[in-house]
Amino acid sequence: MLVQFSAAIAAIGMLSSVALAQGVALTDPQIAHIAYTAGQLDIAGAKQAISRSKNKDVRAFAADMVSDHTAVNKQALDLVKKLNVTPKDNDTSRALTKQAADKRAELSKLKGAEFDKAYIANEVAYHTTVNGALETTLIPSATNPELKSLLQTGLKIFQGHQQHAEQVAAALK
């Protein structure tokens, strides 16, 4: 279960890296779409956790994910409007969306502590992968200084999410 999701979410890094290796650099509109999509997917997963979990720590973590990712995505939308740029859908965004939908369906079959552990384990894997992709691919590939700055700010927030998820995961063992 976790392996399937971890492999799927690695699409951020792998597909982005493949594009770069082939000399096809990601454009700022593609980067903006990937980043926004990743945030929306984490919000959807967090809302699922809020509705299904009874664990106060898991629910608090999920509420933070909704709040923080909503705020970062609002900043992203404000920036693309200011720059008059339309985020461009791409293979990475589509792969992430499909895999996240599959994972939410898988999680919907779990209950109680089993759900909590699986959700938090996914959050650890998700943020580890997203943070790696931000550091190694998305931030270096961004050409607009304001987009690059927003991605760097997001990375700091998401590194905190990763640490928080790791703490909750340890407490659930």
Ranges and model annotations:
Residues 2-7, 12-173:
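His/Met- and acidic-residue-enriched segments that coordinate or traffic transition-metal cofactors
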